[in-house]
């Protein structure tokens, strides 16, 4: 899948890293020189220092071949304008980050597929919305107080322990285990081995705690 992301801030950069690690092709557009330079160093992807509201920049990003476009800057007006321009290229999926909830209706009126409000702008949620839309529906619960994290077990705190000894807690629950790419429903007596990939439903305020718990 080819994804073009506009915005090299925290959300855009983290989203790009998640997609790249999943094997997707990514181009990131950022017009602020420092952020652009940082992204170019961090990402194994094409980084374009330019304005995503400029057609020339979008075409440099090969926008016509994109499967997904994500407007992830903190500027609602720039996000809206870029999405309007990108619609002309018939991109299958367009996603816009909206910082001010009052602006959501404007995005919807111009036909943007997915308008993501502040409580849903976690990069993990956006990544699921792109790669696994059905899973994304499960991620944000209530008013955005939980999300699903995909992690590889590396911490000695959980390696060798049974699922039932680790999960559930009042902060998180293991919802899936992956074995050679196959999804397995966790059972209490399953042993967690180093390198095993798991999906964990975590309360938003416990994301750092859960990440340390499973990855060290």
From Swiss-Prot:
NAD(+) binds at residues 7-11, 30, 73-74, 97. GO terms for cellular component: plasma membrane. Residues 136-216 form the RCK C-terminal domain. PROSITE patterns: RCK_C, RCK_N. Residues 1-116 form the RCK N-terminal domain. The keyword Transport applies. Part of a potassium transport system. This is Trk system potassium uptake protein TrkA homolog. It comes from Methanothermobacter thermautotrophicus (strain ATCC 29096 / DSM 1053 / JCM 10044 / NBRC 100330 / Delta H) (Methanobacterium thermoautotrophicum). The gene is trkA.
């Amino acid at each position: 899948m080819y994804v073009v992301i506009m915005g090299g801030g925290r959300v855009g950069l983290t989203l790009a890293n998640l997609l790249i690690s999943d094997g997707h092709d990514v181009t990131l557009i950022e017009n602020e020189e420092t952020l652009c330079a940082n992204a170019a160093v961090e990402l194994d992807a094409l980084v374009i220092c330019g304005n995503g509201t400029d057609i020339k920049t979008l075409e440099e990003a090969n926008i016509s071949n994109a499967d997904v476009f994500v407007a992830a800057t903190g500027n609602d007006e720039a996000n809206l304008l870029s999405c309007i321009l990108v619609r002309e290229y018939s991109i299958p999926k367009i996603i816009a980050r909206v910082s001010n909830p009052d602006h959501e209706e404007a995005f919807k009126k111009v036909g943007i597929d997915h308008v993501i409000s502040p409580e849903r702008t976690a990069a993990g949620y956006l990544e699921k919305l792109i790669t696994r839309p059905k899973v994304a529906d499960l991620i944000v619960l209530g008013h955005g107080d939980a999300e699903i994290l995909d992690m590889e077990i590396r911490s000695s705190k959980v390696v060798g322990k049974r699922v039932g000894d680790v999960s559930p807690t009042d902060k998180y629950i293991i919802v899936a285990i992956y074995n050679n790419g196959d999804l397995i429903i966790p059972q209490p007596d399953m042993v967690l081995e180093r390198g095993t990939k798991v999906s964990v439903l975590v309360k938003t305020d416990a994301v750092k705690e859960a990440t340390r718990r499973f990855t060290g």
